[in-house]
Amino acid sequence: MSLFIQNDQQRQWMEKIGRIADEFQQTAAEDDEQGRFPAEKIQKLRDAGYTALTLPASHGGGGISVYDMLLFQERLARGDAPTALSIGWHLSVIGELGEGNSWDEDVFAFVAKEVQNGAVINRAATEAKTGSPTRGGRPGTHAVKKDGKWAVNGRKTFTTMSQALDYFLVTAWIEDKQTTGVFLIHKDDPGLSIEETWDMMAMRATGSHDLVLNEVMLDENKLVELLQGPRGAKPNGWLLHIPAIYLGVAQAARDYAVQFASEYSPNSLNGPIKNVPAVQQRTGEMELELLNARHFLFHIAQLYDDPVRRPHLTSELGAAKHIVTNAALSVVDKAMRIVGAKSLERTNPLQRYYRDVRAGLHNPPMDDAVIHKLAAEAFES
């Protein structure tokens, strides 16, 4: 990764995150096996100042760029992808809001102060009946005015990091306004609860349980956004944290396979299997796919970080997610082919990488939406 490190700040944080990732890796398999959300790891990231990095410097944060975030997140994911994905949602939400939000300045300043003090926030937008919010479905969660306050009722699924969040950004349909609003809700607000429903084969340690809202009463200023169209319609480079996670998983799989091939020497060969042409072929293919994915991802991040070039990005952000995620799937598959049947052992990290990397297919934007948009733009040009 030295090729992609551009300054001393990045180098210092990469060294710090590298140490944290290596520490987290020691218990990643146990967290996965138990389906346990590692709250202590999120606290470690809080204590390190990591959770305030994407907060603008004008509001007391680190003010890092999308490019910076991807560097750090990819490294963290090599050691512990579920933890990296979890905190990545917080980092991306704060980065997006700081870049250009329509919130009341006093409300954002309050949230910024909370983040400086270690608060963690995530959006809660997905529902069982609507699917991904990027598809544009109307949320079943609803908000109505009662005695000068907002009463919010509903249920959200896939609420990542639910057990560690201090604040939830909840989408709810407002009938009077005929649009979807976003409400800022604190974890201790009466009527809010977490139902532990998360039991997936992939990303088992993200604690993405259901958020249940039962007559949660909120002050008027807790309505912080009114959405115009489906979420995801506006280009958001901070969502590149998603492919960065799966690039990290792929790199971890590649590293394991290369080490295995360098050390494993069956008695049918005069040396390790790294000398076998088929192994060299697959290893070279892994390297090529990782090179393509990494360079494309970080180039798009650089374009997005440039305010002059950012408006010219159309489908590139979605294409980056598609290219990187599918390359990661392929790399993990090749790594398992190199290692062979041992990669299927429950104690082998490759089987965990295989399960975790598949979650990328179901993070936004979806592959079919990316391809459809590319085709539409081709015919409109």
UniProtKB/Swiss-Prot annotation:
TM ranges: none
Coiled-coil region list: none
Pfam families named among the record's database cross-references: Acyl-CoA_dh_2, Acyl-CoA_dh_M, Acyl-CoA_dh_N
Binding-site residues, FAD: 158-160, 337-341
Cofactor: FAD
Swiss-Prot/TrEMBL induction comment: Induced by methionine. Repressed by sulfate via the cysteine metabolism repressor YrzC/CymR.
Keywords: FAD, Flavoprotein, Oxidoreductase
EC identifiers of the protein: 1.3.99.-
One Gene Ontology MF term: flavin adenine dinucleotide binding
Alphabetical list of PANTHER family matching this protein: ACYL-COA DEHYDROGENASE, ACYL-COA DEHYDROGENASE YDBM-RELATED
Family indicated by similarity: Belongs to the acyl-CoA dehydrogenase family.
Protein name, as recorded: Putative acyl-CoA dehydrogenase YdbM
Organism: Bacillus subtilis (strain 168)
Source taxonomy: Bacteria, Bacillati, Bacillota, Bacilli, Bacillales
